[in-house]
């Protein structure tokens, strides 16, 4: 299975980089995991809703340029569907069973994702109603992907 995580912005904090590298290493026995960073668009401190949409649109074009037609795409979104770790693990397993060997996860920038990115999504996924930095979301997401593979392999990691 090939898993790609497309994220807006560059990860700067070493502790986040270290955590992600650790989970990538752990996942390597189950899947090839690629992380693709696209540049974030600079926005003024105070901006209008139209400027907000323009930033999301520009970032959205950058995201969409990294997604292939055959990929099954999850977009992280507050309004997405929440599921348990077990439900998520079953979805990942089912995708592989039914021929989706390329799965892409999208984490938008601080303003979220554009309508075009959300329309391209096969599924909108939420990790709760809490707001968190998108850099931290990368760690949460990759850990949950790892947890899904561990659940599917029958490992006691999830207990």
UniProtKB/Swiss-Prot annotation:
NCBIfam families: PRK00103.1-3, tRNA_RlmH_YbeA. It comes from the Bacteria. It is found in: Cytoplasm. Its EC number is 2.1.1.177. It catalyses: pseudouridine(1915) in 23S rRNA + S-adenosyl-L-methionine = N(3)-methylpseudouridine(1915) in 23S rRNA + S-adenosyl-L-homocysteine + H(+). It comes from Lactobacillus acidophilus (strain ATCC 700396 / NCK56 / N2 / NCFM). The gene is rlmH. This is Ribosomal RNA large subunit methyltransferase H. Its main location: cytoplasm. SUPFAM superfamilies: alpha/beta knot. Keywords: Cytoplasm, Methyltransferase, rRNA processing, S-adenosyl-L-methionine, Transferase. GO terms for cellular component: cytoplasm. It is an enzyme of class 2 (transferase). Belongs to the RNA methyltransferase RlmH family. S-adenosyl-L-methionine binds at residues 108, 127-132. Homodimer.
